[in-house]
Swiss-Prot record:
Comp. bias (Polar residues): 554-563, 756-770
Domain notes: The RING-type zinc finger domain is required for E3 ligase activity.
Protein's recorded name: E3 ubiquitin-protein ligase PDZRN3
Species annotation: Mus musculus
Reactions it catalyzes: S-ubiquitinyl-[E2 ubiquitin-conjugating enzyme]-L-cysteine + [acceptor protein]-L-lysine = [E2 ubiquitin-conjugating enzyme]-L-cysteine + N(6)-ubiquitinyl-[acceptor protein]-L-lysine
Gene name tied to this protein: Pdzrn3
Assembly information from the UniProt record: Interacts with NLGN1 and EFNB2. Interacts with UBE2D2 and with MUSK via the first PDZ domain. In myotubes, the interaction between PDZRN3 and MUSK is enhanced upon agrin stimulation.
Amino acid sequence: MGFELDRFDGDVDPDLKCALCHKVLEDPLTTPCGHVFCAGCVLPWVVQEGSCPARCRGRLSAKELNHVLPLKRLILKLDIKCAHAARGCGRVVKLQDLPEHLERCDFAPARCRHAGCGQLLLRRDVEAHMRDACDARPVGRCQEGCGLPLTHGEQRAGGHCCARALRAHNGALQARLGALHKALKKEALRAGKREKSLVAQLAAAQLELQMTALRYQKKFTEYSARLDSLSRCVAAPPGGKGEETKSLTLVLHRDSGSLGFNIIGGRPCVDNQDGSSSEGIFVSKIVDSGPAAKEGGLQIHDRIIEVNGKDLSRATHDQAVEAFKTAKEPIVVQVLRRTPRTKMFTPASESQLVDTGTQTDITFEHIMALTKMSSPSPPVLDPYLLPEEHPASHDYYDPNDYMGDIHQDMDREELELEEVGLYRMNSQDKLGLTVCYRTDDEDDIGIYISEIDPNSIAAKDGRIREGDRIIQINGIEVQNREEAVALLTSEENKNFSLLIARPELQLDEGWMDDDRNDFLDDLHMDMLEEQHHQAMQFTASVLQQKKHEEDGGTTDTATILSNQHEKDSGVGRTDESTRNDESSEQENNGEDATASANPLAGQRKLTCSQDTLGSGDLPFSNESFISADCTDVDYLGIPEDECERFRELLELKCQVQSASPYSLYYPSSPLDAAGKSDPESVDKELELLNEELRSIELECLSIVRAHKMQQLKEQYRESWMLHHSGFRNYNTSVDVRRHELSDITELPEKSDKDSSSAYNTGESCRSTPLTLEISPDNSLRRVAEGSSEGATANIEAYRPSPKNLLAITEDPEVSTPSYNPSAKELDPSQALEIKERRGSDGSRSPTASPKLGNAYLPSYHHSPYKHAHIPAHAQHYQSYMHLIQQKSAVEYAQSQMSLVSMCKDLNSSNSVEPRMEWKVKIRSDGTRYITKRPVRDRLLRERALKIREERSGLTTDDDAMSEMKMGRYWSKEERKQHLVKAKEQRRRREFMMQSRLDCLKEQQASDDRKEMNILELSHKKMMKKRNKKIFDNWMTIQELLTHGTKSPDGTRVYNSFLSVTTV
């Protein structure tokens, strides 16, 4: 609204008036048509009417209104009277100075500040009133015993009632106390929410740290494999200097739809026919225990010439992939393999093979045993401790063969030159290269390739690697960074010919350090994965037990894979773009089979990002022939002998705690007496070891944080990024593909009505996650306590299985295993629930079985990892742990209700139910839960993909005609939009109905009708039922005779006949 006209001193220009309120404009806004109005007038009009108030144009929105600053400044310079002119203020000020004057105007209204007065006065008279005239001003304190302040009015009246004054004072204090309690509750709620958010952030950070550790362990395994393969070839001279090439013919057979190797190379395009020999198809990676890794199979660096008679020597990468996809078994592959030339030498004498030292293989088990020893004078270890991943080699080479050409080539570095041609269709295509240059050495002015975009032209070509040095670009020798940028950013060139150089043995500097650093890295990985492995092993054992009960006790991979009625395409995933939310059923089933065949590997995939499992982070683009069906444990980063190694570690630790710490490796050591005489030394060493592990964990966290900061710096470094010239800094992140974790599915159940209490299906976000009672610190102590029963019992006690966990609280007599022949007739999930209910019948007492309590149930106060998903730092918050305990209680109650309902429906569930499948989901805080989802969703996704493929070549008219006749399939996003529109329409419909009811009520209230009494309402009810049943069980004959023949308007109502028989 505008300013009143009579407040201004003098006449006001009519152009400064608002056309709506006819007052002086206040914060003027203009419409696109040129009209000016007050902001308080035009905004409600536009929101309600949607047009200009002058009715000069069509639709108008509030975003189209603009401020008129010159007009506003002109209005602010007008003279205006004070708003308190009616109270006596005669000041006339500028409009822009009016707010400042109102703050200190003496004629502004103000209230007395004494409690109990509240008289409205002028601001200039408040002080005098409070000092002289106010009856509520204090004049002293009561001397009659209450001690409360005495006002002037009470003193003039002759005193006050102390009891009434004390009651009033007490009430005021109670009101203040209540207000403080409310404020305290609000602050507590706010602090609780803050605490939960911080705990969630800490959990997410811990999960990200674990995933980063797993990713680096995966890279470590891959680099170790590369180093092994290069070390085997280090004795052989390079090609053309002592090597010969021979042709081999191999026969391959697919194993579960996979060939088990990766390829790189190929010509960049079909039109380029003059390719060099370096553009062939080469084997870049071979999966262990795969079809290609068998004896007489492929080897790394083999060049593929033919596949089933089809020449691939000059084929492109895509043609080679298609040839392997369409090849029929048996697949006959012709390859070229480099072999060292045979050298004629005389056998060395026997004295040359004699080693004067003693080979001692010190592995990780020895180190863990030595850390448990007591402190007094332990034996001095060899400073070069080799990790288990790199055991000492016992092979002996001939000195003449091994040292043949080393000395003469010691002072010069062998470089491998290669010319790479890149072609782009238009100037918008990106080459995908990120270049950098050295700044620490003045002599080295070369340009190096730091990163390659996986989806770029260079990555698809596959010949350029990270770390290559660019020598020439299009025949021009590159001297500095500016020349390289100018040549690569030229929009006129579509063909780029790059001459690159790389060492023949390209080794990373990070893996050339001494063995002590390698051992420390392995110790970091073991420490970070210790808690993660235990949680994953328990979940995997639960899933494995359920699969075991379904299949009748068999865990054969072939049996599980035969349950899937799907066919493999013959080649595994060859395009990373297929990893999206709407993945095909074929790929999901492949991952299901892997998770069921190897539960530990399946659970490991839950926490690994895509770049740890795929091949996207290799320095060259490759296509994978590795199907998800045959992926083994080694390929997922877990060695095959890891479980056996872990079991041996447990036995070793048990022996260390139960026997002498030096009796394992030094049976006759004189330090045995010292270890036995000091029983507290073991605990001290354990504490020292735990402190050391915590310090290493903090160091690892700092390394990860520094790595992230370095990545951020690299992203904003202008010298390394050339966005508009075809370069791009590609960063592989953990969170980029985190949504893939929610797409991992388990094998579908045949019929499962309710979720079992052994699984937490988590149908909503409020469900309780899986709760594990596993203590990494106390696990060894529990095993050591039962070590008198044998090492085998200790190992089996450490492995938590569903049977053991369900029988924790049973009596020894009830928990005796027995075979139930009728269990096969029941549904697997029902049988599992019945078994769990048997275990829960004996769990009403607070104490557990003494035999099983020590082995499985550690105390809450002694176990820092009672819940697998609760980090150690989160257990210091009492409110958070209290919340977890409440969730556990709710979960137990829900499981009991689920068991009761399942037992009731065992005999009545004969109807055909929809097929369901298990899905492993992940929450925002990092916890996982298992849920059931109908197979119908997956079928709908496949149907959507099929319809999309069928309609890809249709025109608009054909598509419209098909929608009218055949109906249309709505995608997921469109269905969400439909739900939102339906909710909006329902809300509008309810609003209209409510408005109509309110209107009717107002009309009824406007009429001068008298209010109906109970008798009239009873007559109205009887009129509705006069042609129906006369009376019911709650109506007496007297009521019918009294009310049945009357109506509110006085007319007679003819009811049905009523016969009364008096007995």
